[in-house]
Amino acid sequence: NSRIQSIDLLRGLVMIIMALDHVRDYFHADSFLFDPLDLGKTNGAIYFTRWIMHFCAPVFMFLAGTSAAFMARRKTKKELAWFLFTRGIWLIFLELVVVNFGWNFDVLFTNIYFVTIWALGVSMIVLALLIFLPIPLVLVIGFAIIGAHNLFDNFHVQGNTLPAFGWALLHDQAFFDWKGHNVLVGYPLLPWIGIIALG
């Protein structure tokens, strides 16, 4: 067995916490009316189940990078790059087709969400390129992205345009209306690429 049990256990724990948050969303209808982290409106249980979620996506993304580093010990760079690329494409497909359908069971895909699984997929594709660089350089790139991406927080591309959508994919959470489809970019790529690179 080539799997590393501690990584699988941590992934499993993160998945349980994510499931807890999604269950909270379905059974606590008011969570759609106010921020569960608003101390003036929440309670301890609601606050905690939302707060702990902030660790899930970063841990999952970091572990994806860590797993790739362990795979590099038994695969050639070309094999690993192909694995990361194809896995990334598969995750993007799952997010945009299967998961998006599962949210609303809408065959017209009126609502399209670019969220966690999509960001993981694209980050894996970028990592497929980064693995060809020296490891210290990948580390520097990861730290630079994480440390500097907030410098762009005050830069926004306005409107319902392709440039605005492109910038949202990179850095800005945003909603778009595209030919009768509501598009949400919930997980911009830049910070996640930094985290997977550090992993």
Question: Model-found features: residue ranges?
Answer:
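Alpha-helical transmembrane segments and their immediate juxtamembrane cytosolic regions
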Residues: 1-199
